[in-house]
A protein has these predicted regions:
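Gly/Ser/Thr-rich phosphate-binding loop
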Residues: 64, 89-94, 103-163, 176
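Short beta-strand->loop structural element characteristic of the AMP-binding/adenylate-forming
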Residues: 16-19, 46, 68-74, 143
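Conserved pre-ATP/AMP-binding loop-to-beta segment of ANL
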Residues: 1-7, 14, 37-43, 151
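Conserved AMP-binding/adenylation subdomain of ANL enzymes
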Residues: 26-43, 51-91, 105
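Short, well-ordered beta-strand segments
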Residues: 3, 43-45, 51, 120
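Conserved beta-loop-beta connector loops within the AMP-binding
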Residues: 178-192
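Short Gly/Pro-enriched turn/cap motifs at secondary-structure boundaries
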Residues: 166-172, 186
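Conserved AMP-binding A3 loop
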Residues: 3-27
Length: 192
């Protein structure tokens, strides 16, 4: 059965509605819980609107493992920081403009974010300077997700952030990836 439809503006292709099934979302919750260390002690903060995949990215794995979910009613950088510090948030999702707003706060201190075990970014690639500032000033526990509207298929994990700038990462647990050429034929390894 269909679960929801996520609409894409066509950033990387043609605008479309992506139908997601209950089975796909169930797999998504399970694989995300494993890949990003969600557990019953997790305190997850969603910063995006309820129709966003970012919200589902926090909500489903958190509820799947019996964690606690916090939902912001609109994003404000100072309120985000205050909530992370006060509630000792362990998992959060932000889009690149939200990171920029946080990084522009005066007297930003990395210890404000010490409770964060997983910081997720998607929606558009992080610029290298923004990524370096996130890693230095917020958290080194950064995961970047790609193919987000479709449910995402690749992930750049924290240990690869500085080693593989510009990479889209590796396939998410349970996914296989193939590269095709402009004629739709599968490419051999090491060919793009």
């Amino acid at each position: 059965d269909n679960f929801n439809i996520i609409y894409s503006s066509g950033t990387t292709g043609v605008p479309k509605g992506i139908v997601q099934t209950h089975r796909a979302r169930s797999h998504w919750a399970t694989s995300n819980a494993i890949e990003m260390s969600f557990n019953s002690e997790s305190k997850s903060l969603t910063t995006t609107a309820l129709y966003s995949n970012g919200t589902w990215l926090m909500m489903l794995p958190t509820l799947f493992v019996g964690g606690t979910l916090y939902v912001m009613n609109g994003f404000d950088a100072k309120s985000f920081v205050d909530l992370v510090k006060r509630e000792q948030i362990t998992h959060t999702f932000l889009v690149p403009p939200q990171f920029s707003m946080i990084l522009s706060l005066e007297s930003l201190q990395k210890d404000w974010f010490s409770s964060l075990k997983t910081v997720l970014s998607a929606g558009s690639p992080l610029r290298p300077d923004i990524k370096e500032n996130i890693l230095s000033a917020i958290s080194e526990n950064l995961f970047e997700l790609y193919g987000f509207s479709e449910g995402f298929a690749t992930m750049l994990k924290p240990h690869d952030q500085r080693k593989k700038f510009g990479s889209v990462g590796t396939p998410v647990l349970g996914f296989e990836i193939k590269i095709i050429d402009e004629k739709g034929r599968e490419c051999s390894p090491n060919v793009a």
